Amino acid sequence: MRFKAKEHKEIGDLESAYSFAQTHALTEKNLLTAHRLLATTLLPRAALGKYRDQMVYVYSSAGMEYAALEPEHLASAMRQLFGGIRDLRRSSIDLSEAFYHAALIHLVFVHIHPFMDGNGRAARLLEKWFLASKLGRQVWHVPSEMFYKEHVAEYYRNIKLGLNFYTLDYERCVPFLRMLVRSLLSRVEEPEV
């Protein structure tokens, strides 16, 4: 597979963000720094590592798919999310609970949609970062990002739980939560060559 120069830069930006995450604690401030690294090619410098100050809508070829949380509510929603993450990091949870909460953090973050761009990349990084904080460094090798890319239509279908932040139906989130575990199983079940 050949990559264009911009794609090479985006990959390098992601590698920088993941390297940063592997050597820093999972905090809201550090997530903003990681976003600054991963979105360098995506956004103007003034928007890097900063919550958006305008409404965003997610569109597909079929039209508007999702209206994100209003910008005036982002700081509060992110404080609440990171308060929950902090509590989970301090608590004793088992392996299955760690995967459940990591996937749920990913999903909630995507629904908050705090940045002008790079939200999916930041959500996948946040998911992995949380898992590593609970289970150790070996989690950085879990191929979840590749699995999500290989199943991108399913990924977007499973994220879609409502038309806007206020109509999200988390009772329908189980198919999305299962994708993280399936990313592990897909590699275990691959035939050896």
PLM feature segments, named:
Residues M1-V193:
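FIC/Doc superfamily catalytic core
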